[in-house]
């Protein structure tokens, strides 16, 4: 398998509406659904949910 097929690069966009994004990789075999992580948003200055953007 090619490198990009199993662990694609995804963007995690803030749900606070600031437009801030994190970029990470995810394993499609373990997490086939859209990922949601609670991370720090420096624009909002608090922890918010970040959802996977395709």
Curated annotation (Swiss-Prot):
UniProt entry tagged with the keyword Transmembrane: no
InterPro entries referenced in this protein's UniProt entry, alphabetically: Ribosomal_bL33, Ribosomal_bL33_CS, Ribosomal_bL33_sf, Ribosomal_zn-bd
Pfam families, per the entry: Ribosomal_L33
Keywords: Ribonucleoprotein, Ribosomal protein
One GO CC term on file: cytosolic large ribosomal subunit
UniProt record, GO biological process: translation
Keyword Ribonucleoprotein listed: yes
Top-rank lineage group of the source organism: Bacteria
Molecular-function annotations in GO: structural constituent of ribosome
HAMAP family for this protein: Ribosomal_bL33
Family recorded in the similarity comment: Belongs to the bacterial ribosomal protein bL33 family.
NCBIfam families the UniProt entry points to: PRK00595.1, rpmG_bact
Protein name: Large ribosomal subunit protein bL33A
Natural source organism: Streptomyces avermitilis (strain ATCC 31267 / DSM 46492 / JCM 5070 / NBRC 14893 / NCIMB 12804 / NRRL 8165 / MA-4680)
Record gene name: rpmG1
